[in-house]
Amino acid sequence: MSDSISDSKSSELLNSTFYSSTSINTLDHARTFRNSLILKEISDQSLNSSIKPCESVLDRDVESSVLQRSFGESNARDSEVQTVNMTTSPSLSALADILNERSKYADQKTRKAQNIESSIIEEEEEAEEQNNSINYHEDITGSRLSVREEANENLAMTSPNLIDIDGSNSIQVAPLSLPSFEEPDFLSTPRVKPDSQGPRSKVSTRRTILERDNNLPVKREENTIINSETESTTHSAPFLKEDPKPSPPSSKLYNPKVRLNKAEARKYTDSSAQRTTSAGSVLEDTSMHKKKKSIFSFLKKKEPKPVIGNNSVTNEKNKMSSSSTFSMNIQTSLKTPEKLKKKSHSSSSIFNSFLKGKIETSDSPRKEPMRQKKRTPKSKDKKQDTEQIIDAASVLSTESPLLRKNHDDTPVKIDHVTRSIDQRKPTPLNMDLILGGDKQINTPLQEHVREDDDAKNDLQLPTKDNFLSLDYEAPSPAFSKHDTGEVLFPKFLDNHEVDSIVSLERTRSTKSNKRSSMNSQRRSLTDTLSIKAQSEGMFITEASSVVLSTPDLTKSPASSILKNGRFEYSDNFSREHSYEGTTNEDFLDIKDDSGPLKKDDIFLESIEQKFDQLVMASDEEKTEVERDVPKPREEPLKKDSERQSVFADDDNELISDIMEFASFINFGDDDLNLDLDLGDTTASYATETPEPVGNDEVNRSGTFDTRNNKEDSYKERETQSYSAAGATTYGDERQGQLHTFEQDGSEINDNEFENEDFNKHIEQPIEVTPRNNAYLPEFEPNRPVSMSFKGLKAPRMNTSFIDSMTPDSPVKSDLTSLGEVYVNSNNDQGVRFSSQIILYDTYGEFEYDRHPEISTCNQLTPQLAQMIKLELNELKSAMEVHDDSRCYTHFY
């Protein structure tokens, strides 16, 4: 805005009635001050002066606040400022807030309007430079300037009262509504038209827009030039680029790393690059380039249909390659570089982004008219001289490296350029054919193979004339929907494919780590035990390689281990005996080795089957276990009828109660240390005539059995019978043993062994086998295997330590003690341990969860705990404990 306008504004502001000394009303202050800011006289004048092309428009400061510009500039004038006193009015603060809000809204409106005006002015300057260089200044300049002058006059006439804020050469324009020629195309048209109808109509419109600009120089060319063979190729370059500048800016634009994608984006990129070279500020030219492109795209769209007739008439008159043919094929075949495509994607033009999406989806309908136009220049190029062909090729080579493929006869270096451009192309669906080799760019035969899949939508095989239009076409719709100006990484994978690959690899690594950790855990456990055991003279062997069955955790409590697994008795004991048969030197002392071991092996298997039957609660297995009992042991069963009344009187309810709290009770086998005479037990073996066991002694053992485990009852029954009768036979012992297990299978509850553990059953043969002396302390069954051998140092395999009381007695293993009665060997008392450790495989931490459920812990109340304590104390007080062991009994 000129200085005269600023002076008139300030004079009107200071001479208003608001500044008289007689007015003290605050409402009058606000009203007169507001009216003084709206200057009706200078609106049209300042708008017309700002429309004139001036270089200072681009340098204005848009970000300064409105209030500073309105008050600060008026205060920065002459000495007239001293007459303004704004501190006495109480309404100035409220008025300042209102004006600040309204000025912000007006500033947003004026920025949009000034962007449009500056883009029109800049486009006008470009058009003038272009017309002066190509010698048709009169036609184009007159047409374009007339359109812009009419638009500027419409803006000046239809604009409302404006607020002149600062005194520079720029002006803030606040239009109430956009001009009529801008509103429908800029905002409404892209939103109304659907996508399904878009491709065909949009392609024809877009093609005529480009042809219309390129036909104007063709009409001028007919009237002025006679021999226009070389001039047509020379003129095609300026229409492609809009500025006839030398090669340095074009080489900057057509970097081999850059690929153009759309005709309109390429066209405005050229002009912006030329302006960047000529103008001083690169940043301002780039921003103006975005705004100019948005307004120029719909100004060219007005009258497409009459221009089509001019193009056809021009081609028929000349019968030669017109500039529109070359420029049409060049612009549609070129691809937008991804860096420049990001600039165009970030533009504020809604219509431009909508048009880019339409052009991208309508590449296939555009191919067919391009091929028809392409055949004409190829036929005419053959008639030209060699010098003219080379000249045209050199002109075109400075502008677009992609045009070098049209001239097959000229030795142009296109290998590096096209390959580098092709590497940055988005991935098409026929990636396997494109990646076949590096020679596919040079040889036309491989380009035929490459373009077969691209031309399927046109139902037309690729010919020699349409290599340019097919070779660098847009990507397929599957990839173009993701290609919105952003660089996809990795290049040849979709985002969904990358996510699926990442999740798949993560799942595989998790599974493999879980398997390896479980296996390494078990191996490391075995190796650790082996190292410790070998240092103490023991050896560890795996029980079996049979895979354990998966536990059913829903049907068993968390504390039950026996309920979740089954015995691998056939493999375990066969491996155990075969291993000991080859390495145990104590087996060599046995005279009859095969017979007793086979019988004892069968007997051990029957014991394990019995445990398995009690766990699984199968009636069929009960009968099988009873059938599996060895035949030589069936003779002592004749006296079972005498002992049927023993367990018939047992209190089954008491047994079930004991088994219910079996996990809390340690009955303590070591506490049952009966003070028996050693001479009586040795004399019992000396007597050869068996004596029957009395019924009263059997009843004693039966009553004791109801309050203890079955192992304890059998052991106590043996010791009672030995102490009372003095001697017994092996048949009676076997008879009592078989009687115990048959009564367990018939009358004892199946849940009796719910809380037993594996370690106790592994040591079961030690408990049920008859001992030579009742005074021998029994092995503690509740201790695990690893604790049982802790601190033992055997010199070699299968040798055992002798009890301190009997240091000179021979040594036997536990399994050989099963056959000592058959061998009739005289052995003294002693505790024997095997140096072989059998490591049974259990469930890992990932397969079996030992943590109890939270609901179980929450159900335990103080009253329930007190009841459990009283019941356990009562149960312990009712036990038959030796008098010497009473002091060791623990009560809760």
Swiss-Prot record:
Record's subunit section: May interact with CHS3 and seems to be an adapter (along with SKT5) to link CHS3 to septins.
Organism listed in the record: Saccharomyces cerevisiae (strain ATCC 204508 / S288c)
Residue numbers carrying Phosphoserine: 43, 133, 281, 364, 394, 476, 500, 503, 618, 746, 825
Organism domain of life: Eukaryota
GO molecular function ontology, one term from the record: actin binding
UniProt keyword terms in alphabetical order: Phosphoprotein
Residues modified to Phosphothreonine: 410, 703
Biased composition (Low complexity): 346-356
UniProt biased composition (Basic and acidic residues): 208-223, 357-371, 624-643, 707-719
Full protein name: Protein BNI4
Amino acid composition bias (Polar residues), ranges on this chain: 224-236, 270-280, 309-335
GO (cellular component) term, any one: cellular bud neck septin collar
GO biological process: actin cytoskeleton organization; chitin biosynthetic process; division septum assembly
Phenotype seen when the gene is deleted: CHS3 abnormally localized to vacuole.
Region (Disordered): 185-287, 305-387, 506-526, 618-644, 685-734
